[in-house]
Amino acid sequence: MAQSTLYSRVLGTGSYLPPDRVTNQELADRLAKDGIETSDEWIVARTGIHARHFAAPDVTTSDLAFVAAQRAIEAADVDPQSIDLIIVATSTPDFVFPSTACLLQNKLGIKNGGAAFDVQAVCSGFAYALAMADSFIRTGQHRTALIVGAETFSRILDFKDRTTCVLFGDGAGAVVLSASEEPGILGSALHADGSYSNILCTPGNVNRGVIAGSAFLHMDGQAVFKLAVNVLEKVAVEALSKAALAPEQIDWLIPHQANIRIMTSTCRKLGLPQERMIVTVDEHGNTSAASIPLALDVAVRDGRIKRGQHVLIEGVGGGFTWGASVFRY
């Protein structure tokens, strides 16, 4: 008897935002105390962001990941001990090592010895992690994967730089992916170009117990915008081609929630109506690797994304990295 083709499909989603919601006006008031001028109108006009969430000083990235993971596991209705692969996409890990994924595995009480590791592709991290987990499952190496995007970007923001500190927030999103004979993940594409590493980076490093270089995020906004709008359409089309789907067959587009102008530009280039694009950047800000699974969970739980629908995710981030996946939910 011929062996059936193995696929991976999304069983459940989850997300978590720390309770400290900071509006643009509240952030502007904080910055004004240090002589930094900005306003709600200025931020909204350039980014579409109205608010973001910041984690408390004693809350770690793995803490955020833990809650999102619990919610995804509950939604998937799986035994945590059946999860034999954990991938955490983050650029703000708890420690230099061990990985946030190992810390999360322990917090979840998973004792089966399954693989656990982090992926560092910044805002493309979740797209990278999802594609990697899909490959592991399709080849039979693992059967049930927990993929988490989690960030505490507030820890690396320079609050004297209004061009970056107004953009980012903290949060986590998660999905449970499981082996299935029914197609789920239909096509993925991943890319990087290290020659653009300087346009979005946090260049500091630990050297003999001292942070060498800047530990703050640095960004050339214009260069990032120009590159992002160019590569996102191309990688989306590539993933669609691998999935044997046309753009008009996509029910929902979930772009990395970086900036409403980048998001709408990609949506327009793909010929999709704006109504099919999931937008959470207005309330969450840019949560880097957490932004796509956060938006996915919001749209699943409010009933917009339904079983059987086609979803296209795409992300672009520091590195420079970019990626996309198409899946049937």
Curated annotation (Swiss-Prot):
Listed pathway(s): Lipid metabolism; fatty acid biosynthesis
Keywords: Acyltransferase, Cytoplasm, Fatty acid biosynthesis, Fatty acid metabolism, Lipid biosynthesis, Lipid metabolism, Multifunctional enzyme, Transferase
This protein's GO CC annotations: cytoplasm
GO molecular function: 3-oxoacyl-[acyl-carrier-protein] synthase activity; beta-ketoacyl-acyl-carrier-protein synthase III activity
Key word Lyase present: no
GO biological process: fatty acid biosynthetic process; secondary metabolite biosynthetic process
Protein's cellular compartments: Cytoplasm
EC number in record: 2.3.1.180
Domain of life: Bacteria
Enzyme class: transferase
Coiled-coil annotated residue ranges, if any: none
InterPro entries: ACP_syn_III_C, ACP_syn_III_N, FabH, Thiolase-like
Presence of the UniProt keyword Cytoplasm in the record: yes
Catalyses which reaction(s): malonyl-[ACP] + acetyl-CoA + H(+) = 3-oxobutanoyl-[ACP] + CO2 + CoA
Ranges for region ACP-binding: 257-261
Active-site residues from the entry: 123, 256, 286
Pfam families hit by this protein: ACP_syn_III, ACP_syn_III_C
UniProt domain comment: The last Arg residue of the ACP-binding site is essential for the weak association between ACP/AcpP and FabH.
Recorded family membership: Belongs to the thiolase-like superfamily. FabH family.
Function: Catalyzes the condensation reaction of fatty acid synthesis by the addition to an acyl acceptor of two carbons from malonyl-ACP. Catalyzes the first condensation reaction which initiates fatty acid synthesis and may therefore play a role in governing the total rate of fatty acid production. Possesses both acetoacetyl-ACP synthase and acetyl transacylase activities. Its substrate specificity determines the biosynthesis of branched-chain and/or straight-chain of fatty acids.
PANTHER family: 3-OXOACYL-[ACYL-CARRIER-PROTEIN] SYNTHASE 3, BETA-KETOACYL-[ACYL-CARRIER-PROTEIN] SYNTHASE III
Assembly and interaction partners: Homodimer.
Descriptive protein name: Beta-ketoacyl-[acyl-carrier-protein] synthase III
Gene name as annotated: fabH
